[in-house]
Amino acid sequence: MPQVDPELFDRGQFQAELALKASPIAAFKKAIRLAGEVLDKRFRAGSEIRPLIEARAWLVDNILQQAWNQFDWGDQSGIALVAVGGYGRGELHPHSDIDLLILLGAAEHEQYRDAIERFLTLLWDIGLEVGQSVRTVDECAEQARADLTVITNLMESRTICGPEALRQRMLEVTSTAHMWPSKEFFLAKRAELKARHHKYNDTEYNLEPNVKGSPGGLRDIQTVLWVARRQYGTLNLHALAGEGFLLESENELLASSQDFLWKVRYALHMLAGRAEDRLLFDHQRSLATLLGYGDDNPKRAIEQFMQQYYRVVMSISQLCDLIVQHFEEVILADEESGSTQPLNARFRLHDGYIEAANPNVFKRTPFAMLEIFVLMAQRPEIKGVRADTVRLLREHRHLIDDTFRTDIRNTSLFIELFKCEIGIHRNLRRMNRYGILGRYLPEFGLIVGQMQHDLFHIYTVDAHTLNLIKHLRKLQYTPVSEKFPLASKLMGRLPKPELIYLAGLYHDIGKGRQGDHSEIGAVDAQKFCERHQLPAWDSRLIVWLVQNHLVMSTTAQRKDLSDPQVINDFALHVGDETRLDYLYVLTVADINATNPSLWNSWRASLLRQLYTETKRALRRGLENPLDREEQIRQTQSSALDILVREGTDPDDVEQLWSQLGDDYFLKHNAADVAWHTDAILQQPADGGPLVLIKETTQREFEGGTQIFIYAPDQHDFFAVTVAAMSQLNLNIHDARIITSSSQFTLDTYIVLDNDGGSIGDNPQRVKQIRDGLTEALRNPEDYPTIIQRRVPRQLKHFDFPPQVTILNDAQRPVTILEITAPDRPGLLARLGRIFLEFDLSLQNAKIATLGERVEDVFFITDADNQPLSDPQLCSRLQEAIVQQLQAGQGSDTSPTRVTF
């Protein structure tokens, strides 16, 4: 800490001001305010962070000493003001708590009571954010013995005012000779660290991480220092290196990483104007600017800043893991342990952990840097890597160069890892953590810590990739196999499962580079296959999967799967059943590894439908596709059989069906047609809207809830329907709109509840939905179609210009309207009003919410049931949609991207 810094605080000048003022409060406040401005100015000017946080602690020392001296303490030998915790370490950020201990020598301290109360009142009056306790030395010992947090705080202490002897007495009675021996303290701190990491999902890669508490955060560094202090009396990272727990290079890396997090935390406090350790979306853009991450694209600047953050915390996490493992081996060492078992000439087992047979293993035989991970995958009983060997890996990874990457021993070992029955994900994760994977595959190194600034991708690209591989592996185990039965079945019968793991490793590797990441990744995958001398068939499949890994999810979510042409086109693109099997499994794993909340029962049902229909088309033969007329005949014939068996008059059926167009029979299966027909024929002429509700499938974890509405076609019908569903907390995922020749609407909606599941067997909920919709549709003109709801905090930070695309389908008489926009309440109802205003008919809709954005596709026609053909009408429609969406956002955006 600085000895004297008159620009920050001049003692003589301050005391002179105190003498001139009747009340000291104004002088203290002025001194604190001016010093804060000086420190903030230094920060913005690029001052090093360590002197800044030490200078703030020095400033507070001086303020506290001046405040302490305002009171008559009498005999000061029995009282001391002690800094503890972070302030005790001499580290203070702009709004950090100032933790104080007023330490008393004896239980009888009545003579100090009045001065203590007045002193603490003054601190609050002058605006210091103080956390204080008043304890005797004996009380410190009693509470420290019972509370891990108390003993930790007392270990980091400094005397600010009063006799140092009191603090030394306190340190003596709380030493390892009396409580918390180093082994017990280490076990408690290790458990505390694990619990804290679990609170943050055991990942450094949260979208809104906590700079202090998340894995790899400042608290991890503090934890290893606390343990070292309890064991060795070591006070800082440099001293820790002196004890042999860190190499000098590791000490420098850990110190620079700590400085980076200190800068981020300091800036966070400045921007928030309060103690804030969470990297909320609210602050990420301002932080990126303040810390100097410049880019024409603000989103890209945020991603650059966050990538550095993630890489820093990953480094901290790796080094702290290494130190903690060293502590385990030293502090928890059992005199009778130490049994070793040779594995081969290069490695042995030591108490269940693998270690290098000698320090020169990786230098003499560099291929051992890959072999160690293959051995762990082949021997699942191996618990992990001993700390010294982890360090050897880190020290020798520079040997992984182009020569290493093309050595057949290394390429063979890497492929061998993917052929292991278990341990693929675990050991790829270790390779990534130790920095080996990014060295062996430089293209993978580019995506380490790379985030995408949105709510859809909740993991960095490298974490998502490894999660995908983990999900592929878990498909073979219950209960995961029960939730994904088809994917699990297909995974178990893939002829070469290692190929889907390799495709998964490369599927997003092209992200962060200019261009289509699927195409870039396919080029990288081709080079990988050539370097690893994979057979031609294997290479073609891997490259094709990387290039097309988004095709199946895009088709299922954005195309009309009831259209035979859509199925035939997709089947032509896939080509054969083997590719279809691989692609389906990869798609399921990709979606679930992107964002767990993205997967729902309806998306599962769509993918199964696309898989099943495509497989049927492939088996029928691509040269012999099913046409629309044949599909309509099959549906009508099967539905009529069901109705006749139930006693329905075929003439009544024929009369009703004659009023319906072909699209109705294309968009519904035979069972649903029979269900609808029976209910409509039994509906009284003046019975009001008919609302039917049922589940679309009996398979657990698949399907959605189907709501069928039959009613006279009325003004604002679609807008009222979707608004009512929104009020009922239903999420619409699919809509099929049919208008009969008798001007009745037959609308089918697929909905899910807010939890992402179908309504299921819940009579009360079904009745609530039926009653709510019936009431709204009975008098639609009286129902408010614009739903006013508060926009969630996170969504507010992801405004972007809406994108509206209008194009005509070359194979069907409809116009396709594609909308990508920020997710906002009431969006569908707003669009319904626009369709009404432009006299448009909605034929079908595919609704997808992806994080903070919606990607909706509407199939529309004009009043004559024809595709839109007037360019001026299309232009006005686009303009109206953009205006409505921007009104829903409540903020200005730049003009939309428009495509005809």
UniProtKB/Swiss-Prot annotation:
Coiled coil: none annotated. Residues 706-784, 816-900 form the ACT domain. Its cofactor is Mg(2+). Signal peptide: none annotated. GO terms for molecular function: [protein-PII] uridylyltransferase activity; phosphoric diester hydrolase activity. Has four distinct domains: an N-terminal nucleotidyltransferase (NT) domain responsible for UTase activity, a central HD domain that encodes UR activity, and two C-terminal ACT domains that seem to have a role in glutamine sensing. Its EC number is 2.7.7.59, 3.1.4.-. It catalyses: [protein-PII]-L-tyrosine + UTP = [protein-PII]-uridylyl-L-tyrosine + diphosphate; [protein-PII]-uridylyl-L-tyrosine + H2O = [protein-PII]-L-tyrosine + UMP + H(+). Belongs to the GlnD family. Transmembrane segments: none annotated. GO terms for biological process: regulation of nitrogen utilization. Residues 461-583 form the HD domain. Modifies, by uridylylation and deuridylylation, the PII regulatory proteins (GlnB and homologs), in response to the nitrogen status of the cell that GlnD senses through the glutamine level. Under low glutamine levels, catalyzes the conversion of the PII proteins and UTP to PII-UMP and PPi, while under higher glutamine levels, GlnD hydrolyzes PII-UMP to PII and UMP (deuridylylation). Thus, controls uridylylation state and activity of the PII proteins, and plays an important role in the regulation of nitrogen assimilation and metabolism. CDD domains: ACT_ACR-UUR-like_2, ACT_UUR-like_1, HDc, NT_GlnE_GlnD_like. Uridylyltransferase (UTase) activity is inhibited by glutamine, while glutamine activates uridylyl-removing (UR) activity. Keywords: Hydrolase, Magnesium, Multifunctional enzyme, Nucleotidyltransferase, Repeat, Transferase. Residues 1-342 are annotated as: Uridylyltransferase. It comes from Pseudomonas putida (strain GB-1). PROSITE patterns: ACT, HD. This is Bifunctional uridylyltransferase/uridylyl-removing enzyme. Residues 343-705 are annotated as: Uridylyl-removing. It comes from the Bacteria.
